[in-house]
Amino acid sequence: MSITPERKQALISEYGAKAGDTGSPEVQVAILSERISNLTEHFKSHNKDNHSRRGLLKLVSQRRSLLDYLKKKDEGRYKTLIGRLGLRR
């Protein structure tokens, strides 16, 4: 369910502005999207796992908040990010 440190570093290098950039909204949204997709796969075989489903809803809400913040601050970066991640908006 969690992502490996190697995968997290790959996401940071792909979406970050520089090597150690873990705080930018783009990196945070990319990491949350990876965790959300992992949990979605988990629910295909464990559909009664309601405890983890609550965690998934929290992750989706957190990602939504970060995307709203990014859209408010810089709409160009927002549109680029959702295009790169393949999010519907």
Curated annotation (Swiss-Prot):
What biological processes does GO assign it?
translation
Q: Name one GO molecular function term.
A: structural constituent of ribosome
The record's annotation in PROSITE patterns points to: RIBOSOMAL_S15
Q: Which SUPFAM superfamilies match?
A: S15/NS1 RNA-binding domain
**SMART domains referenced in this protein's UniProt entry, alphabetically:** Ribosomal_S15
Which Pfam family is one of this chain's hits?
Ribosomal_S15
Q: Which InterPro entries match?
A: Ribosomal_uS15, Ribosomal_uS15_bac-type, uS15_NS1_RNA-bd_sf
**Listed transmembrane segments:** none
- Mind naming one GO cellular-component term on file for this protein? cytosolic small ribosomal subunit
| Keywords from the UniProt entry | Ribonucleoprotein, Ribosomal protein, RNA-binding, rRNA-binding
| Family named by the database record | Belongs to the universal ribosomal protein uS15 family.
**Known partners and oligomeric status:** Part of the 30S ribosomal subunit. Forms a bridge to the 50S subunit in the 70S ribosome, contacting the 23S rRNA.
Function field = One of the primary rRNA binding proteins, it binds directly to 16S rRNA where it helps nucleate assembly of the platform of the 30S subunit by binding and bridging several RNA helices of the 16S rRNA. Forms an intersubunit bridge (bridge B4) with the 23S rRNA of the 50S subunit in the ribosome.
Give the protein name, as stated in the record.
Answer: Small ribosomal subunit protein uS15
Q: What is the lineage of its organism?
A: Bacteria, Pseudomonadati, Pseudomonadota, Alphaproteobacteria, Hyphomicrobiales
